[in-house]
């Protein structure tokens, strides 16, 4: 029986699931928006939100905790220098999941997961203004 077990299995072993979610979290922090299946996006949100909460206060212990989960110095630096101060006044809900239809091969529901206060690139608008 499956009583009191949280999270999704996503048809993977636990080690594969953990490494996949770490890689997806790194991609989300790097690009600030990624496209994935809806269930993976919902599971990724459970991983990403506590990391952003830790990155709001820049202490050595918080840096070590975040590094133990992410394992990439460049992304940890970006979290504490750029993303943490950006989300300092927000109490939670750092990510947004937007449904974007179904995948053509197997009709799996797809979604974009993005950081809420991300800076959008408006290169087209800058070119049009010139």
From Swiss-Prot:
Pfam families: Ribosomal_L17 (PF01196). It comes from the Bacteria. Keywords: Ribonucleoprotein, Ribosomal protein. GO terms for cellular component: cytosolic large ribosomal subunit. One of its GO terms (biological process) is translation. InterPro entries: Ribosomal_bL17, Ribosomal_bL17_CS, Ribosomal_bL17_sf. GO terms for molecular function: structural constituent of ribosome. SUPFAM superfamilies: Prokaryotic ribosomal protein L17. Belongs to the bacterial ribosomal protein bL17 family. Part of the 50S ribosomal subunit. Contacts protein L32. This is Large ribosomal subunit protein bL17.
């Amino acid at each position: 029986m499956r009583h009191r077990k949280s999270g999704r299995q996503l048809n993977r072993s636990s080690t594969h699931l953990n490494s996949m979610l770490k890689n997806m979290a790194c991609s989300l922090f790097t690009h600030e928006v990624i496209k994935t299946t809806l269930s993976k996006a919902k599971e990724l949100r459970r991983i990403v939100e506590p990391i952003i909460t830790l990155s709001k206060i820049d202490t050595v212990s918080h840096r070590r905790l975040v590094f133990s989960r992410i394992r990439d110095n460049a992304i940890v630096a970006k979290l504490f220098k750029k993303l943490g101060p950006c989300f300092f006044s927000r109490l939670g809900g750092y990510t947004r999941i937007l449904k974007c239809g179904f995948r053509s091969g197997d009709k799996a529901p797809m979604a974009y997961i993005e950081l809420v206060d991300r800076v959008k690139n408006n290169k087209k608008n800058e070119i049009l203004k010139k």
